[in-house]
Amino acid sequence: ATFTFGVKENNYLGKGLGVEANATINEESFKGLFSVNNPNYNNSDKSLYTIFKATETDRLSNFGYKSNLIGLELGTKFQYLKQFNFGLSGRSFYEDIQTDSSASDKQKKQSGSYWDTFTSVSFDLDKRNQKFKTTEVYRSSFTSDLPIITKTNTFTNKYVYNYYSELYENNITNFSLYLKSARSLTNDDIKLSERLYIPGRRLRGFESGKIGPKDGSDFIGGNYITSLNFSTTLPQILENSQNVDFLLFLDAANV
């Protein structure tokens, strides 16, 4: 079983600050996040944000390894040109990986402590007619994480494209493409925490984290992921209901 809980405030203390805290817990892992975002820092029309993150993955009993990661990210985002946003951030993480005699050779090689620092740049072209219930045009974004201080020199890229259309009255149709890669610039094996999994909302109906390459019977994620998603609302079903929405979707993905 997985339990998720969190709180989010968009106008903390009446100062316009965005504050969010959430946690996800299951029998093998804990993921926690706390973030503060100032969307108009010093009246500059630039957002300034801080993210604190902590995770623990405990698979000692089943696969012979355990990982603890804690880190901090500082960044900014702003509109560089009309409908074009630019982001820049730096983040550092400390990770400790422990293994025992039952771990695979791949995991034993990664045992130890790591200090990793990355710089991230993002480009976001947002042509949507509105952020909520978008019915027209598209949004295209690209993010790249550049290794600064790492043992594995993992270089990560992500591209997301969303196209929206209103095929008929009150309908919202969306097509989405999601591409992500993580590979070592020095041809090292990247860490388990850096490997990629299909996000659950991009492959609905499957157990999250249970798709893709295995190390023995352990799902360890991949270096490349792709997903195609299509969805369309069906407003003609219970069209007088304000609380119920019907959605037809098709998801396809590869790890």
Predicted segments with their positions:
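Transmembrane beta-barrel wall of Gram-negative outer-membrane proteins
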Residues: 32-111
